[in-house]
């Protein structure tokens, strides 16, 4: 039985149950500020009172573009306590694609009908123009001004079926869709994660995270799941981790962390970047769960991380915990069982490509390896379905569908998208995979599947092979198909720092042909930072394919990381923002 019925109730009462636990926030230099949960209740009440003085009421939507974890968490929870619905938005990653960023942010604020945008002070000169661009948006508020808020809020009744917040999807190929996350689905999923998955729930355990808080894994997993179960949570600024990955393990070591989650790339990055001295200084025997999800899990990455940190930093090798989840299921769907060994299944590649059946390999056959994401949580069910809607037997690949109390209500003000994804009593995930011996194996995305000469080829398998070729930036490879004369052809796009592209292309083509029996028709080499990515760092295959087909791939305007940007574009956005800000001041907004 969950401790609380709503997140609002948890924020108000958890400090009385677990007075010694709370949130710890690091700044970019590593200095830490700690708030016990009783202090969190007081601070969020003050911020909520300030929101009510602005005229915000239960059911209103507000945007959050907040860089600092402390301001984000306290403002988010303040809104939730009074029934104001937060809409988390990512900050601009660079000025290289500012037009696209402003367009998406405008769309999300418009679709959610947000009344107020809370933003970090350093972003205001770029964001103020949105006040004019979004009809419902009344003002932009510097989130730092809420630090001095006084008074106590008046708390309306919050029910389990009330909306807690809206989680907007990346929207790389269409308008973003706002997943409606209720208090009921949050409480159900957080209970499944903490109690069933991690065997916690009585204030025990310490969570450590560097994940962005505007995405579901960071927000639900480390802000909401922890406070609803009285756990302490330590927050590292995302950019601090990106600049120096070892700060993640430092924080776990010092705080005696027990749980942390990250995508596959982070485990590869920290394994690559940590030094011998750092490894020798860490004692990670405290860790019970190094969760891995949000993107395909590479078996070699997992094995490398387990080997390095179990032998050099005293980590329990069973702590590595593959997981499966998605925003429409609130967050998590399945976990590898705690204290069990990480498992994979090696199958016959040709048989799988031709029939979709996962079977042991025949003698001499090419093979494919899939990571088990464990069984689904109690009261939840995952099954694979075929193209005609038939439920498939175990070990046969199809679209994964889910049902259970963690499934969200639908998409905000988008009945067409809701009806397409939430129907027949199931959430249609769009993911490909199979269930075998009660465990979930995720093989890819339905829309990304490549069909070559009648064989189903998963882009992840190609990308992993290419990523192992010396000179290729691991985790920065995209595979897709293009129209050929008689059938689809394979294209591989990669990032590299190498100057000899011709030799690298030859090596890539040879590796793919040898390991998977599929010859690429084209291999494209890009300099670092040119592959399209989402705000959470996920590669965008369909956008990459679209840019490839239109000849836009690799142009300066499409750079996603490390771009300096077009000075004219930046100046234009700042001028619009300054004009909007001046006009609002004159009008008294």
Model segments located where?
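Conserved pre-ATP/AMP-binding loop-to-beta segment of ANL
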Residues: 19-21, 150-168, 174-175, 180, ...
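Conserved AMP-binding/adenylate-forming core of the ANL superfamily
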Residues: 23-69, 73-77, 94-103, 155-157, ...
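Conserved AMP-binding/adenylation subdomain of ANL enzymes
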Residues: 187-206, 216-258, 273-278
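AMP-binding/adenylate-forming catalytic core of the ANL superfamily
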Residues: 253, 260, 404, 409-410, ...
